[in-house]
């Protein structure tokens, strides 16, 4: 028994085959193009993403040597918030996918805030009014692509996050659905009642006719043969990437916390079966609905984590490969008072300031590129602590360890600095593809390979454990330097 998992991320699409114990058999990655039509705008081509998905699935099966008949289910995890609208009749997108990083909805969000509606929306959806989430992206497409608004009102247009788009295409238009974790990131879901909220839809002027059906992550979302399998298999195990990462790390219980380090970063705390919506900028979302039980999470997202390292390479040209940053950072005894605030598309949680620009502070004549590299790595850890402290304040939960995943967890400097700056141990996943493993676990649970969540948790092991070893005085000195840098930018 095998499960094929699709992990559709910001940079590319992975197809991964898991065995019945949740172990990786084989993986294939296909990257897609990034489009930046204007400063602060980011787009993907939905058709390219679907083609790449089919290519990755075909290749991973061929290269693995597994018989196609042995694959029992298809699971999907995806970049969240990214918004696609398409014609129901033709299945063709009306515009490119507007990516989660894209800031084009900023003016609409500001207008809604000025109308005094943010509190009401936060209470219902658990989210802050920000262009990061799907609602303002949907509205932009409706307002700016000719003819789409009228077609939407007539029920001819479908909206979906990437999971919905793939499910629609894989089922040849038979199923238009999403799961609650993805829906809760649109800024349109009432997280208390688990339904689309009519009042919020009216505020954003979004017709309900375009919305997908809501399903639990362990529902069967339809059937597909991917265009080449000898039989149709169920699509089961659908979850947004950050929720899937928490699930894949075994974060099933209240108080469990994980940090996913990707292009951006997601810090997510399981808070149990009831939402906790506060006036804090930390958002509350649906982690998942599995076995008819809802798990809610507090989440803080930062826009630039791995993306900051890519910037060092592609724009500054001071590294030729991201792996060099570890050695460069370790060559310094300290940070020299240099701080990089990577607000390339504004600041995410807990500040939510889309107007702030990136800056390097504290540079002096004796500083070199190594100080900038170290400051870039440190910025990731500081942003995670900003979120962590706010989560502890809201939830009154004191996590005793952090589960970490994502490509840059291989950077030993960053992981040790993260443990030091949080002052709790960091457990690093033994695989990078924890989001895919999360949805594979859901599919395997559905197929009967596991009896319950605890059995899954016992299967999870970690590659490394980083214990904090920095003194209290030094820790707080570093962190206060970061807070000072942030204050300067926020008050400019």
Swiss-Prot record:
Binding-site positions, ATP: 10-11, 263, 306, 407
Pfam family, one: FGGY_N
Residues binding ADP, per UniProt: 10, 14, 263, 306, 407, 411
Enzyme Commission number: 2.7.1.30
PROSITE patterns in UniProt: FGGY_KINASES_1, FGGY_KINASES_2
Pathway(s) it belongs to: Polyol metabolism; glycerol degradation via glycerol kinase pathway; sn-glycerol 3-phosphate from glycerol: step 1/1
Keywords, alphabetical: ATP-binding, Glycerol metabolism, Kinase, Nucleotide-binding, Transferase
Binding-site residues for sn-glycerol 3-phosphate, renumbered to this chain: 10, 80-81, 132, 241
Example GO molecular function: ATP binding
Known catalytic reactions: glycerol + ATP = sn-glycerol 3-phosphate + ADP + H(+)
One BP term from GO: glycerol-3-phosphate metabolic process
A cellular component annotation (GO) from this entry: cytosol
Binding positions for glycerol per the UniProt entry: 80-81, 132, 241
Regulation: Inhibited by fructose 1,6-bisphosphate (FBP).
Transmembrane segments: none
UniProt-listed InterPro entries: ATPase_NBD, Carb_kinase_FGGY, Carb_kinase_FGGY_CS, FGGY_C, FGGY_N, Glycerol_kin
Function of the protein: Key enzyme in the regulation of glycerol uptake and metabolism. Catalyzes the phosphorylation of glycerol to yield sn-glycerol 3-phosphate.
Family: Belongs to the FGGY kinase family.
Protein name: Glycerol kinase 1
High-level lineage: Bacteria, Thermotogati, Thermotogota, Thermotogae, Thermotogales
Gene: glpK1
């Amino acid at each position: 028994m095998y499960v094929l998992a699709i992990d559709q991320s910001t940079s590319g699409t992975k197809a991964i085959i898991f065995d019945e114990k949740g172990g990786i058999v084989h993986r294939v990655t296909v990257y897609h193009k990034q489009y930046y039509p204007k400063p602060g705008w980011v787009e993907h081509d939905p058709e390219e993403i679907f083609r790449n998905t089919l290519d990755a699935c075909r290749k991973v099966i061929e290269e693995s040597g597994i018989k196609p008949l042995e694959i029992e289910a298809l699971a999907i995890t995806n970049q969240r918030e990214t918004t696609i609208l398409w014609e129901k009749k033709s299945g063709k997108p009306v515009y490119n996918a507007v990516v989660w990083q894209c800031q084009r909805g900023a003016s609409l969000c500001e207008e809604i805030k000025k109308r005094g509606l943010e509190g009401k929306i936060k209470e219902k959806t658990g989210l802050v009014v920000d262009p990061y989430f799907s609602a303002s992206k949907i509205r932009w497409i409706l307002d700016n692509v000719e003819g789409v608004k009228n077609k939407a009102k007539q029920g001819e247009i479908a909206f979906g996050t990437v999971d919905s788009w793939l499910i629609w295409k894989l089922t040849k238009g038979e199923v238009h659905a999403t799961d609650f974790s993805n829906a809760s990131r649109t800024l349109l879901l009432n997280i208390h009642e688990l339904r689309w909220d009519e009042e919020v839809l009216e505020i954003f002027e979004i017709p309900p006719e375009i919305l997908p059906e809501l399903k639990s992550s362990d529902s069967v979302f339809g059937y597909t043969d991917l265009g080449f399998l000898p039989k149709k298999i169920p699509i089961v195990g659908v979850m947004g990437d950050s929720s899937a990462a928490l699930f894949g790390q075994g974060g099933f219980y209240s108080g469990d916390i994980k940090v996913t380090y990707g292009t951006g970063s997601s810090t997510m705390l399981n808070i149990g079966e009831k939402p906790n919506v506060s006036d804090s900028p930390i958002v509350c979302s649906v982690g998942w609905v599995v076995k008819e039980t809802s798990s809610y999470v507090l989440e803080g997202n930062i826009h630039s984590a791995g993306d900051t390292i890519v910037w060092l390479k592609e724009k500054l040209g001071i590294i030729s490969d991201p792996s060099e940053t570890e050695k460069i950072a370790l060559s310094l005894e300290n940070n020299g008072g240099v701080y990089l605030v990577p607000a390339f598309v504004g600041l995410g949680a807990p500040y939510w300031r889309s107007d702030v620009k990136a800056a390097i502070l504290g540079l002096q004549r004796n500083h070199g590129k190594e100080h900038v590299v170290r400051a870039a790595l440190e910025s990731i850890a500081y942003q995670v602590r900003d979120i962590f402290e706010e989560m502890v304040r809201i939830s009154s939960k004191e996590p005793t360890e952090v589960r970490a995943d994502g490509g840059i967890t291989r950077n030993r400097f960053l992981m040790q600095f993260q443990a030091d700056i949080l002052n709790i141990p960091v457990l690093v996943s033994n695989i990078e593809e924890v989001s895919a493993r999360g949805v594979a676990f859901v599919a395997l649970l559905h197929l009967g390979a596991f009896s319950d969540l605890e059995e899954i948790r016992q299967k999870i092991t970690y590659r490394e454990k980083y214990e904090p070893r920095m003194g209290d005085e030094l820790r707080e000195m570093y962190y206060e330097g970061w807070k000072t840098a942030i204050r300067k930018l926020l008050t400019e």
